[in-house]
Regions:
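C-terminal accessory/regulatory regions appended to core domains
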Residues: 1-173
Length: 173
């Protein structure tokens, strides 16, 4: 499989020029548009469709900081994250996860919008700090530690989604 960075002819780096990424995405999608292959043979149409899918997958990877970091780790180690087998070994973070889940549950039960807003801000701040730490680990080529940050960020992303769901339920009342 081709590197998402190579597909867009971008340097392998955690910080990606999003404007340049969008520009190159549009150019690739335009060149692979089905209208360009109307008179082409079936095999050529199929190849264009596969390339278009590859471009879309690469875009998704490069737009998401966690997926982007995992791509960098995979390129440098030859190993991909096995999400089914992953669980963080950081006991302190596991305890923090339990506390956050309990806090969110209590906020939802109490229907306290101010507490939810405050909690969401704390999670957002934690996520931002962890992204900064992840970038530092990637720059220092500390692949195992960077992978652990990816795991933690995946949890925080899921927690942020759960916060949004609680927010929606609170505002429905």
């Amino acid at each position: 499989m081709t590197s998402p960075f190579a597909i867009f002819d971008l340097p392998v780096a955690f910080n990606v020029d999003q404007a340049l990424l969008s520009e190159r995405y549009l150019a690739l999608q335009k060149s692979l548009h089905p209208d360009n292959f109307v008179t082409a043979e079936a095999q050529e149409q199929r190849i264009a469709m596969q390339k278009s899918t590859e471009v879309n997958d690469a875009l998704k990877t490069l737009k998401d900081p966690i997926l982007r970091a995992e791509a960098i780790i995979a390129l440098n180690t030859g190993k991909t994250q096995d999400l089914e087998q992953k669980s963080t070994q950081d006991v302190t973070f596991l305890m923090q996860q339990l506390e956050w889940r309990e806090e969110l549950e209590n906020i939802e039960q109490s229907q306290d919008e101010n507490a939810l807003e405050s909690f969401a801000k704390r999670v957002k701040k934690e996520t931002k700090e962890m992204l900064t730490a992840l970038e530092a680990q990637l720059n220092e080529q500390q692949w195992p530690t960077a992978a652990q940050f990816c795991d933690k960020l995946r949890f925080l992303k899921k927690l942020a989604d759960e916060i949004s769901q609680v927010e929606e339920r609170l505002f429905e009342l």
